[in-house]
Amino acid sequence: MVDKLKSYTKEDLIASGRSELFGENGPPLPSGNMLMMDRIIEMTENGGTHDKGYIEAELDITPDLWFFDCHFIDDPVMPGCLGLDAMWQLVGFFLGWLGGEGKGRALGVGEVKFTGQVLPTAKKVTYRINFKRVINRKLIMGLADGEVLVDGKIIYTATDLKVGLFKDTSAF
């Protein structure tokens, strides 16, 4: 049984990447540079706009983050796909938090809109995930809407983020 904490530290998230948080069969988060959050500040099983679950997480922005050096030279900006991936990471984390087992895989997104950017001068990115549905049968899948904010301003929105958990990904 998974301890359902309401918040998680960076150390907890790193432990998830080593399969130490939700057990050896739980979905791990990415590790290293691909872990796109520093903390989860709120998790609820019944909250959010659809009353099906909610997560809020944060990433501290500093000018020395790895992607600013290569995307782009003389025009540093966080790649939008990393914000989208962070939202998928959080959907998968939620499924593990609920006790789901397997390896997480992004399955799609309905629509993504970018209306701003993350520059090295920013201080904090906030991710908000509102769950619409969780299927927990033979297939374990989360469906959610998400927002990415930079310093309190919404800059990306995504509808129908889909993540599934798979016991065997060899034929995926």
From Swiss-Prot:
Chief place of localization: cytoplasm
Key word Methyltransferase present: no
Any one GO cellular component localisation term in the record: cytoplasm
Entry superkingdom: Bacteria
One function term, GO molecular function aspect: (3R)-hydroxyacyl-[acyl-carrier-protein] dehydratase activity
Keywords: Cytoplasm, Fatty acid biosynthesis, Fatty acid metabolism, Isomerase, Lipid biosynthesis, Lipid metabolism, Lyase
GO biological process: unsaturated fatty acid biosynthetic process
Pathway stated in the Swiss-Prot or TrEMBL entry: Lipid metabolism; fatty acid biosynthesis
Catalytic activity as recorded in UniProt: a (3R)-hydroxyacyl-[ACP] = a (2E)-enoyl-[ACP] + H2O; (3R)-hydroxydecanoyl-[ACP] = (2E)-decenoyl-[ACP] + H2O; (2E)-decenoyl-[ACP] = (3Z)-decenoyl-[ACP]
EC number per UniProt: 4.2.1.59, 5.3.3.14
Active-site residues, record numbering mapped to chain: H71
InterPro entries with a match to the protein in the record: FabA, FabA_FabZ, HotDog_dom_sf
Biological function: Necessary for the introduction of cis unsaturation into fatty acids. Catalyzes the dehydration of (3R)-3-hydroxydecanoyl-ACP to E-(2)-decenoyl-ACP and then its isomerization to Z-(3)-decenoyl-ACP. Can catalyze the dehydratase reaction for beta-hydroxyacyl-ACPs with saturated chain lengths up to 16:0, being most active on intermediate chain length.
Family (UniProt): Belongs to the thioester dehydratase family. FabA subfamily.
NCBIfam families per record: fabA, PRK05174.1
Subunit structure: Homodimer.
Protein name: 3-hydroxydecanoyl-[acyl-carrier-protein] dehydratase
Organism: Photorhabdus laumondii subsp. laumondii (strain DSM 15139 / CIP 105565 / TT01) (Photorhabdus luminescens subsp. laumondii)
Classification lineage: Bacteria, Pseudomonadati, Pseudomonadota, Gammaproteobacteria, Enterobacterales
Annotated gene: fabA
